[in-house]
From Swiss-Prot:
Keywords in alphabetical order: Allosteric enzyme, Cytoplasm, Hydrolase, Metal-binding, Protease, Sodium, Stress response, Threonine protease
Primary enzyme class: hydrolase
Protein name (database record): ATP-dependent protease subunit HslV
PROSITE patterns membership: PROTEASOME_BETA_2
Active site residues according to the UniProt entry: 12
Family note: Belongs to the peptidase T1B family. HslV subfamily.
GO term, biological process aspect, one: proteolysis involved in protein catabolic process
Record organism: Brucella ovis (strain ATCC 25840 / 63/290 / NCTC 10512)
Subunit composition and interactions: A double ring-shaped homohexamer of HslV is capped on each side by a ring-shaped HslU homohexamer. The assembly of the HslU/HslV complex is dependent on binding of ATP.
InterPro entries: ATP-dep_Prtase_HsIV_su (IPR022281), Ntn_hydrolases_N (IPR029055), Proteasome_sua/b (IPR001353), Proteasome_suB-type (IPR023333)
Amino acid sequence: MIEHNPTTIYGTTIVTVRKDGKVVIAGDGQVSLGNTVMKGNARKVRRIGKGNVIAGFAGATADAFTLLERLEAKLEQYPDQLMRASVELAKDWRTDRYLRKLEAMMLVADSKATLALTGTGDVLEPEQGVMAIGSGGNYALAAARALIETDKSAEEIARKAMNIAADICIYTNHNIIVESLDAQ
């Protein structure tokens, strides 16, 4: 049996789907401290920049907000260039002593690109327009990949994937927040 540190904040699930001219990021609202649900309606998916980028985060909340702020600063420096801003953030993440200790991951998307920014400073693009992170990420990813070839919309796929993850992962709930953008 796996022992969990009761003072560590665990889990969330974030999924992104890009399909048929839409890009969606969805996330649940649960915040757990050890084996206790501390909050069920946290907002882990939001619009950043000028509202033309959506982001979802998993991991330590304070760390995630630090990274969101840094990404917003990079987007101001490189307007309408999500890939460039993300790569520049990743460079900082890998070289800055303070940032290297941050324990968070993010999925970000604009009309042109969907990216995962990992805790090791990697910038990854999804296969098949689908990617997921967090404690229920593998469940959401499997569900979304199974549904991507159906006639369901990007939002329907993301919601179904999140509900499946919430049914399986104890650190994920059914309070799902969705943000979407028109995609190229």
